[in-house]
């Protein structure tokens, strides 16, 4: 009986030590870094999910929105007093347009959440997609179809290329849209 008690105590001590060391970030294979990565992944997934929800809802309800043309290349869609969607076609005279690129901006609660842009050259189409949340870019897909996911998001200063250009133009667009439509009660 004494041997079995010692064996149980030894096993208990080993299990207890294993539990203690498993919780230690220095020794545990599951460190705080993987926790941070998981949280970052959850944020980027949330940004993409919100953008998709906004995109599908906007496309579904497009005919219900108030359509306002701003010049020959820009069309805004309003739901009550909120801008929900803008389409900007290429025009050398329009500083909001991007050369040879049709841009679609999707807004939720007056914030840019998704930008879709495309360039047509003959039969070839180049597409760009950028997913935003809280002023940061969480995912970008360029014409090479390569998905760039930024777990903790990229601020405007750290964005590059088309993701940065779309963010800048999309935010400038919403500011101008609210200023232009203030007199008719859309602000």
Language model region names:
Residues 41-73, 121-187:
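Long terminal segments
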Residues 22-42:
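Sec-dependent signal peptide cleavage junction
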Residues 9-10, 29-33, 56, 73:
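A detector of low-complexity, intrinsically disordered, Ser/Thr/Gly/Pro/Ala-rich segments
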Residues 4, 28-29, 170:
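Glycine-centered structural positions embedded in regular secondary structure
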